[in-house]
């Protein structure tokens, strides 16, 4: 079985037709992890025994002629900030080393209901704070297209696992681009749905008004399938919408004739790599040839989204991460004098530099004397940006931009330049600020590295995203190109 090119929906058909057993699929993916993950570092934990046991149980269901779930027998990886019962949930942080989740997140419950199987937990930036997965306190992850480069972040391990054939599908979280940016860097499809489309129950909170669980897949149909399976209302997350979930994977169409697509000029200005710009412009021409009506538009306030985002996200992080105090659970310093010292030293030793930087920033902007000048103004800017996006979505079915201003950058290239790292999210954070859905799909290659095309639409219009993405995908070959991980001519220092 060619794990690099076969899709989840094709795998399910093969299982249904008894061309392959679930156990064979599980063993093939485990062999793939053994083969390449020592180089890539996608996984923090692989549930080998549990995967094989579940696979055997599912094979028995087939032999009994039982009805198969939508994700029957499909190996799925899960970012290590989403709870899976009896598996670790470390957020790639020393603070949570050894923590085992006693329950399933809502999305994991849904995966199990549809009979998908969890292969393991993937690496990430610590507490989802980062854009390269370099902030993991546990291990370094590498881009499967070039082992000297980052996979993006914070859901870097999830993107790697799909791009490298180590999982058929993956679940991640997106607070400012953490699914779409690594999807772009690794050449896969990544969706951040509308805020409230998918329950966040069981996901460790970073920025509660920004966080959203989303999906990563090798192609649009797989992404649509996983999204429809895990979406829906959850009473344990009051932000979820009580709305019917469309059958996204069954309504895909290449026909986008007459669809109005806007091209915001602010996304094509200074800072965008010329070769990336060319790839995105060529992608826009494909959509035009497929019948879409293309028109330039303007969202002038979008340039303030990044600044507003980092103020709001840091403020929410400083509140959410206060629970990690070395007393209730998690890492506890052994060198302390009293209760206050436990708190101070446990957080100082257990949290990484980027996490501490954002906690300090968040505490600062929420403090007396600065609340009005920073946090309150950021909330006002957020509202104005949201209003502009809502207005633009009345005119267009979708708007298109690059996912990132560059392709994947080299390991350590931006680690010490915080602002340069933050700017890699400049095109993705507006979707989180506003809550609209956005998807990244492969649209080209630049110097051997994937380029991502970002498509955004109005609230709960994921079906439009999937159709525009599917139309482009069916007219091009970019989604079918896979990395050659076995090349040995690269000095990647392992």
UniProtKB/Swiss-Prot annotation:
Cite the active-site annotation.
79, 154, 178
Mind naming one GO cellular-component term on file for this protein? glutamyl-tRNA(Gln) amidotransferase complex
Q: Name one GO biological process term.
A: translation
Q: Which reaction does it catalyse?
A: L-glutamyl-tRNA(Gln) + L-glutamine + ATP + H2O = L-glutaminyl-tRNA(Gln) + L-glutamate + ADP + phosphate + H(+)
Q: Is Protein biosynthesis tagged as a keyword?
A: yes
Q: What is its EC number?
A: 6.3.5.7
Q: What class of enzyme is it?
A: ligase
Recorded GO MF terms: ATP binding; glutaminyl-tRNA synthase (glutamine-hydrolyzing) activity
**Key words of the record:** ATP-binding, Ligase, Nucleotide-binding, Protein biosynthesis
Q: Which Pfam family is an annotated match for this chain, by its short name?
A: Amidase
Superkingdom: Bacteria
Q: List residues traversing the bilayer.
A: none
UniProt lists the family membership as follows: Belongs to the amidase family. GatA subfamily.
NCBIfam families noted in UniProt? gatA (TIGR00132)
Q: Which PANTHER family match?
A: GLUTAMYL-TRNA(GLN) AMIDOTRANSFERASE SUBUNIT A, TRANSAMIDASE
Protein purpose: Allows the formation of correctly charged Gln-tRNA(Gln) through the transamidation of misacylated Glu-tRNA(Gln) in organisms which lack glutaminyl-tRNA synthetase. The reaction takes place in the presence of glutamine and ATP through an activated gamma-phospho-Glu-tRNA(Gln).
Tell me how this protein assembles. Heterotrimer of A, B and C subunits.
What is this protein's name?
Glutamyl-tRNA(Gln) amidotransferase subunit A
Q: What is the organism field in this record?
A: Clostridium kluyveri (strain NBRC 12016)
């Amino acid at each position: 079985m060619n794990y690099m090119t076969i899709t989840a929906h094709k795998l399910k058909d093969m299982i249904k037709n008894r061309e392959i057993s679930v156990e064979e699929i599980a063993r093939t993916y485990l062999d793939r992890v053994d083969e390449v993950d020592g180089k890539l570092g996608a996984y923090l934990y692989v549930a080998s025994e549990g995967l094989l046991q579940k696979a055997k149980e599912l094979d028995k269901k087939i032999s009994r002629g039982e009805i198969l779930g939508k994700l029957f027998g499909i190996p799925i990886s899960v970012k290590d900030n989403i709870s899976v019962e009896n598996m670790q949930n470390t957020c790639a942080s020393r603070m949570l080393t050894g923590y085992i989740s006693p329950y399933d997140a809502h999305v994991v419950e849904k995966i199990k209901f549809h009979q998908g199987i969890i292969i393991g937990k993937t690496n990430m930036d610590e507490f989802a704070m980062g854009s390269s997965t370099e902030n993991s306190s546990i291990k370094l992850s590498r881009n499967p297209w070039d082992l000297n480069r980052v996979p993006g972040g914070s859901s870097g391990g999830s993107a790697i696992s799909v791009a490298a054939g180590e999982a058929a599908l993956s679940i991640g979280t997106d607070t400012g681009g953490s699914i779409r940016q690594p999807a772009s860097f690794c050449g896969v499809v990544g969706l951040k749905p509308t805020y409230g489309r998918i329950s966040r129950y069981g996901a460790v909170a970073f920025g509660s008004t920004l966080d959203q669980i989303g999906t990563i897949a090798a192609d649009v149909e797989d992404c649509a399938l996983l999204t429809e399976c895990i979406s829906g209302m959850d009473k344990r997350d009051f932000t979820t919408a009580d709305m019917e979930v469309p059958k996204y994977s069954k309504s895909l169409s290449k026909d986008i004739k007459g669809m109005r697509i806007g091209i915001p000029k602010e996304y094509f200005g200074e800072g965008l790599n010329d070769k990336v710009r060319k790839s995105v412009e060529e992608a826009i021409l494909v959509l035009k040839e497929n019948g879409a009506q293309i028109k330039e538009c303007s969202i002038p306030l979008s340039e303030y989204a990044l600044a507003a985002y980092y103020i709001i996200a840091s403020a929410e992080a400083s509140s959410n991460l206060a629970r990690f105090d070395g007393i209730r659970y998690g890492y506890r310093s052994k060198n302390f004098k009293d209760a206050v010292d436990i708190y101070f030293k446990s957080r100082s030793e257990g949290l990484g530099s980027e996490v501490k930087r954002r906690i300090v920033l968040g505490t600062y902007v929420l403090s007396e004397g600065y609340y009005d000048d920073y946090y309150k103004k950021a909330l006002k800017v957020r509202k104005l940006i949201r209003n502009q996006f809502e207005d633009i979505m009345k005119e267009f079915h979708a708007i298109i931009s690059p996912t990132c201003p560059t392709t994947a950058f080299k390991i350590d290239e931006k680690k010490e330049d915080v602002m340069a790292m933050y700017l890699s999210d400049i095109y993705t954070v507006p979707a989180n600020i506003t809550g609209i859905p956005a998807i990244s799909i492969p649209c080209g290659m630049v110097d051997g590295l994937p380029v991502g095309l970002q498509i955004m639409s109005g609230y709960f219009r994921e079906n439009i995203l999937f159709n525009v993405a599917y139309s482009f995908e069916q007219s091009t070959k970019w989604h079918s190109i896979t990395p050659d991980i076995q090349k040995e001519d690269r000095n990647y220092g392992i």
